[in-house]
Amino acid sequence: MLLGRPLSLADLEEIARRGRPVAICAEARERAAASRRAIDAIAAAGDAAPAVYGINTGFGALAETRIADHDIRALQRNLVRSHACGVGPELGEAEVRAMIVLRAQVIALGHSGVRTEVLDLLAALLERRVSPRIPAQGSVGASGDLAPLAHLALTLIGEGEARFEGQLLPSAVALAKAGLAPIELAAKEGLALINGTQYMTALGALALRDAAALCTVADIAGAVSLEALMGSKRPFDERLMRVRPHPGQAGTAGNLRALLGGSEIMQSHADCPRVQDAYSLRCMPQVHGATRDAVAWAAEVLTREVNSVTDNPTVFLGDGADGGAELISGGNFHGQPVALALDLAAMAAAELANISERRVEQLVNPALSTGLTPFLAPHSGLHSGFMIAQVASASLVSENKVLCHPASVDSIPSSAGREDHVSMGSISARKLAQVIENVRSSLAIELITAAQGVDQRLPLRPSAGVAAAHAAIRRVVPGLTEDRPLYRDIAAAAELIQSGALIAAVEEAVGPLN
């Protein structure tokens, strides 16, 4: 994968989660070197140079403080040290790797004025799997994700801590064990490394990749539930989708038609007197589809951000009146576009769990389940079956409702009022990641519950798609013949979802799904 060229969210996921190798493209090296020459020209002028933010001035509310030439390098080092104020749990390796990729991508676009040596060290961290220790909390999302990115930059200068080969080590030790050496920051480089949206974008991009997959998982889970509840596939008729042409709705309906074709269960009740199913079954295209569309829009926003320059000041070559370089101070570090997109994505993803939990209620409630045993227990009363599995899903759904409060509507002024509006996008990203985890668990509960319902419909066979999903579930979760702790089953089903094995098994039976 070449940094400095357009990256997709799928590309980012491949590098962050699956270790796909990266390299810096030749054009990126040329761009970075050219922008660095502009910074070197300012630094070479020494105290005679004009005041340029972040090169020979202080930061934030101290931007009017002029820094002497002999302190230029110390200024950058002090910036990184002072801004490393993160708190809370440590980020996982995939999230840290995504941050490294995105920070390198910004530099590779050639508007940051950072030396290629820094770019190479970032790429080497990925190659050697050196993972800086980055606390998850401490950013307000403008001027970018300062605190988490400062922890990343600490490792580059041999300070802070990093993980290497499973051990948490002083960064200098981790670098040495990996055959790397720390760098000394030159003019502007500390600022260029910490000023940007790479924390919120990294977490958000990975969460959106998960959200997109969960849209398909929700369709699969809903199809299994529909078979267990002896529901109808008629509401998914393509003609209905054509007269309300939302793409996500059409995508979900197409999945459901593919998943439900050729079902003995469905054929057995084709002439039943029931006119309509509950909304949680009948309206899956409209609800799941709306989530698909919202997640797709958020992914478009994040894809633009992945390939954007969020540095400040920004170096432009050949734009000055004399044909030379020009540095422009602006606000590209502000995370509002990302924050709004991730807040919407959290609300959209939460709906997958909202409607899933209602289907679980249909499955366990004998008044709604069309002949299934109460709580799907083998001997209801002596055994409680899936009674508390539904309660667990309800808990996750309610937690998501709290997490869906938008962080992006909040702002707290900082830096003595100079930074008087912030995005809180880092909180949006962390909330989305937790919502996604909760949705995955909710869908896992639906899958194991619905699979039990399908068992009770034997000897009638479900559709090929539902049979494939059922078989995949049964490979990791046996049927319930008597009460047992279900937490291991829920975790196993959640892993089946997260690994992609469920979707793969179903697609093998019915072909590619949306």
Swiss-Prot record:
Pathway: Amino-acid degradation; L-histidine degradation into L-glutamate; N-formimidoyl-L-glutamate from L-histidine: step 1/3
EC number: 4.3.1.3
GO-annotated biological processes: L-histidine catabolic process to glutamate and formamide; L-histidine catabolic process to glutamate and formate
Coiled coil: none
Reactions this protein catalyses: L-histidine = trans-urocanate + NH4(+)
UniProt entry keywords in alphabetical sequence: Cytoplasm, Histidine metabolism, Lyase
Protein family according to the UniProt entry: Belongs to the PAL/histidase family.
Gene Ontology cellular-component terms listed: cytoplasm
Organism: Sorangium cellulosum (strain So ce56)
UniProt cross-references to CDD domains, sorted A to Z: PAL-HAL
Top-level lineage group: Bacteria
Name listed for the protein in its UniProt record: Histidine ammonia-lyase
Presence of the UniProt keyword Lyase in the record: yes
InterPro entries: Aromatic_Lyase, Fumarase/histidase_N, HutH, L-Aspartase-like, Phe/His_NH3-lyase_AS
Pfam family, one: Lyase_aromatic
Gene3D superfamilies attached to this UniProt entry: Fumarase/aspartase (Central domain) (1.20.200.10), Fumarase/aspartase (N-terminal domain) (1.10.275.10)
HAMAP family xref list: His_ammonia_lyase
Cellular location(s): Cytoplasm
